[in-house]
Swiss-Prot record:
GO terms for biological process: cartilage condensation; common myeloid progenitor cell proliferation; dorsal spinal cord development; olfactory bulb interneuron differentiation; pattern specification process; regulation of cell differentiation; regulation of gene expression. This is Homeobox protein unc-4 homolog. Belongs to the paired homeobox family. Unc-4 subfamily. Residues 87-107, 161-312, 324-344, 401-531 are annotated as: Disordered. Residues 244-254, 269-278, 407-420, 484-503 have a biased composition (Pro residues). The keyword Transcription applies. Residues 224-236, 255-268, 421-438, 504-519 have a biased composition (Low complexity). GO terms for molecular function: DNA-binding transcription factor activity, RNA polymerase II-specific; sequence-specific double-stranded DNA binding. Residues 105-164 bind DNA.
Length: 531
């Protein structure tokens, strides 16, 4: 304890009590004490000046402490009696366990030689827990410190326990290269194959579950439901007869007699209070409702595309296209809205039943499943006819008295298919692209009843067939540009006025007929104002 305190204050050891501490036999005066202290410091500095000794690396305090603790070499070295001038050397510096308690030296890792390891292994095989006497004997024989022998035995016992628990030899490969049981025994090949099969099945089930989840998320997402745009409000407003079509030429099934009759009979406009369905018809159709000329065809678009994309006849064309097996084009038509109702029927039988019942939609056509929101309108209030049939009945109750042809009547097979431009809503375009007023002049109801917003459907069809016969002459501007002339028409079985014969009409389209209009005919090139 005393020398520890002296090491903490190295200059305090050279005070007046130095003689008592060292055990010096003679009383020392102040002069001798200072002289002794000077020699002690010089010797410590000399010991520290040796560049590669342990004491020089650790500082001179340990050397000074060792010289103070060891009283035997004190007088010859301190007083210079020996005259050799050799610095002090720690007597037990080779033993790290016997170092002075004040100096904390870091222990380096002990490198055992092969011979030392062999002897230690032999001793370990004899006894895993050697006593202190056996450890001391090993340390003396192997030129080691007893503490290092003790630590080696501790580490060797831990390694042995680990090897016994896992049966893992020193040269064994990685733990997962050869499958073993929990006790370390090798597994049977059948068990290995069974485990591999279970792992593959588990991975396959996980992959299938992930695929199903991604498909369900894709079908219920808004991007998976509507391919072109957001769903329209036709399901809420009841306008199920109007199904939008993309701008592509109609298939041959849409140009049949039934499609022509339905398109001609449904030419009445929608009610004024109902907004147009998005993407259904040309936007110019709605401002021109007040004129009897109808919509103007688009300048850069063929007239048959306008005819195919407007009117309830397009819905029948869509049903026929679905019955023919063609891909469904419209994502928010009535077929797609009503597709995933619980009874799933075949598409062909649905289309035939819908055509026979006069429906413009087939409720069971297959498409992407939709949620059940908004279906109650169609299930509770089925639409039995296109929306265009309701308007002529309300508008012509005091007019010409012509009732439209019933929807349930079979289509007339004798009526030839008119060119697509004549089956459209629009007027026949004149030479300058303006609507021709001869179309309005040939319709008796359009001039006789100015209050009606649109002419009756039946004269439209008869007029179209009559115009088709005149178009064969080649001198009518609009019929000549529309398409080739069809064969001459047969008498129509549907109710309506008798179509004017070619003998009663002049061959040219520009001259008005004498008795066709009840009122004065407007001049050429002007639209008829129906307001």
């Amino acid at each position: 304890m005393m020398d520890g305190r002296l090491l903490e204050h190295p200059h305090a050891q050279f005070g007046g009590s130095l003689g008592g501490v060292v055990g010096f036999p003679y009383p020392l005066g102040h002069h001798h004490v200072y002289e002794l202290a000077g020699h002690q410091l010089q010797s410590a500095a000399a010991a520290a000046s040796v560049p590669f000794s342990i004491d020089g690396l650790l500082g001179g305090s340990c050397a000074a402490a060792a010289s103070v603790v060891n009283p035997t070499p004190l007088l010859p070295a301190a007083c210079g009696v020996g005259g050799d001038g050799q610095p002090f050397k720690l007597s037990d510096s080779g033993d790290p366990d016997k170092e002075s308690p004040g100096c904390k030296r870091r222990r380096t890792r002990t490198n055992f030689t092969g011979w030392q390891l062999e002897e230690l292994e032999k001793a370990f095989n004899e006894s895993h827990y050697p006593d202190v006497f056996m450890r001391e004997a090993l340390a003396l024989r192997l030129d080691l410190v007893e503490s290092r022998v003790q630590v080696w035995f501790q580490n060797r016992r831990a390694k042995w326990r680990k090897k016994e628990n896992t049966k893992k030899g020193p040269g064994r490969p990685a733990h997962n290269s050869h499958p073993t049981t929990c006790s370390g025994e090798p597994m049977d090949p059948e068990e290995i194959a069974r485990k591999e099969l279970e792992k593959m099945e588990k991975k396959k089930r996980k992959h299938e579950k992930k695929l199903l989840k991604s498909q369900g998320r894709h079908l219920h997402s808004p991007g998976g439901l509507s391919l072109h745009s957001a769903p329209s409000s036709d399901s809420d407003s009841g306008g199920g007869g109007l199904s939008p079509e993309p701008p592509e030429p109609p298939p041959p099934a849409a140009k049949g007699p039934g499609a022509h009759a339905s398109g001609a009979a449904g030419t009445a406009p929608a009610p004024p209070g109902e907004p147009p369905a998005p993407g259904t018809c040309d936007p110019a159709f709605y401002p021109s409702q007040r004129s009897g000329a109808g919509p103007q065809p688009r300048p850069g678009r063929p007239a048959d595309k306008d005819a195919a994309s407007c009117g309830p006849g397009a819905a029948v064309a869509a049903v026929e296209r679905g019955a023919a097996g063609l891909p469904k084009a419209s994502p928010f038509s009535v077929e797609s809205l009503l597709s995933d109702s619980p009874p799933r029927r075949k598409a062909a039988s649905n289309a035939a039943a819908a055509a026979a019942a006069g429906l413009d939609f087939a409720p069971g056509l297959p498409c992407a499943p939709r949620t059940l929101i908004g279906k109650g309108h169609f299930l509770l209030y089925p639409i039995t006819q296109p929306l265009g049939f309701l308007v002529p009945q309300a508008a012509l109750k005091g007019g010409a008295g012509l009732e439209p042809a019933p929807k349930d009547a079979p289509p007339a097979p004798a009526v030839p298919p008119a060119p697509p431009a004549q089956a459209s809503f629009g007027a026949f375009s004149g030479p300058g692209g303006a609507p021709d007023s001869a179309f309005a002049r040939r319709s008796p109801d359009a001039v006789a009843s100015p209050g009606a917003p649109a002419p009756a459907p039946a004269p439209f069809r008869d007029l179209a067939s009559a115009a088709a016969t005149e178009g064969g002459g080649g001198d009518c501007a609009d019929a000549g540009t529309a398409g080739p002339a069809p064969p001459p028409p047969a008498p129509s079985p549907r109710p309506g006025p008798r179509p004017p014969s070619p003998a009663e009409e002049p061959a040219t389209c520009g001259v008005p007929e004498p008795g066709a209009a009840a009122g004065p005919s407007p001049p050429e090139g002007e639209e008829l104002d129906m307001d």
